[in-house]
Design a protein with these regions (language model features):
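Non-heme Fe(II) oxygenase catalytic core, chiefly the N-lobe of the double-stranded beta-helix
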Residues: 1-258
Length: 261
């Protein structure tokens, strides 16, 4: 899904000036190369990283959200279903010092080696729910925004990486004027269950993509209920928070030759 020719989100980033400084391998357009500095790799001769000091040199590694941590699922969430898996291979590990990331404001920071990738488990989030919350989540669908990354391009990430900072939407919500969501007419807009079930093990997991979220569709009695965007974001943030505690996440310290699926 990283193809800069076919993926609308990757194309959009390039059109905005490719601030991420990421490039695809000419012979394998679905493979995107991330990093910092000059490279000559499988026919790709470029300077990676653009203006960002993210790869091992700052607290963030995201173009979106001003360089803050962003928990996410790889995928466009528009026009195409998410992939079955994400695959990352380390050619050359970043150099530099690691840092403590105080993402929850609880005095329990994440230790992030230079250029590390953090993983959170939707299964842990689901298992941490109460019985009533699980029942509610199992009856919940997530409606995603049309062209979600373009729509939210200017919004910063929240400190905990589980939502976005959207002052206008927050003000409407706080004023009691938030309208419920409504299904989109765009045929490429995506709707998925909030809870995904592994077909092999039957284990269940919360699997939202917070940045792309438009609203939640829930069930109240026999009726379907559509929540507003801020109410939906707050619910997802609350449900996912237990999965991003420092002792629950996995931080991968990249070494040359590592392959992570």
């Amino acid at each position: 899904w990283r193809d800069q020719r076919e993926n609308p989100w990757e194309r959009y980033k390039v059109e905005q000036g490719n601030k991420a400084g990421t490039y695809q391998i000419p012979s394998e357009p679905g493979v995107l190369v991330l990093g910092k500095g000059e490279i000559d790799h499988y026919g790709l001769k470029v300077t990676l990283g653009g203006d960002r000091a993210a790869y091992g040199k700052s607290a963030g590694s995201q173009v979106l959200g001003g360089g803050a941590l962003q928990w996410h699922i790889d995928g466009t969430f528009y026009g195409h279903a998410p992939g079955h898996y994400t695959q990352m291979r380390c050619i050359e590990p970043p150099t530099g010092k690691g840092h403590w990331l105080e993402h929850l404001g609880l005095g329990d920071p994440l230790w992030c080696p230079a250029g590390a990738t953090a993983f959170a488990s939707g299964r842990i989030a689901y298992d941490a729910l109460t019985g009533a919350e699980r029942e509610a989540c199992l009856d919940t669908k997530v409606h995603y925004l049309p062209k979600p990354f373009e729509t939210t391009y200017s919004l910063a990430n929240s400190q905990n990486g589980l939502s976005v900072v959207d002052p206008d939407a927050e003000a409407i919500y706080e004023g009691g004027n938030e309208a419920p969501g409504a299904p989109f007419a765009d045929p490429a807009a995506q709707v998925y269950p909030l809870v995904w079930t592994c077909p092999d093990t039957g284990r269940q997991a919360l699997m939202p993509q917070p940045r792309c979220l438009a609203f939640l569709e829930t069930k109240k009695g026999a009726k379907r209920q559509f929540l507003g965007i801020t109410a939906s974001r707050r619910l997802v943030e609350n449900w996912m928070r237990p999965a991003v505690f420092a002792d629950q996440g996995y931080i991968h310290d990249w070494q040359a030759g590592d392959l992570v699926l």
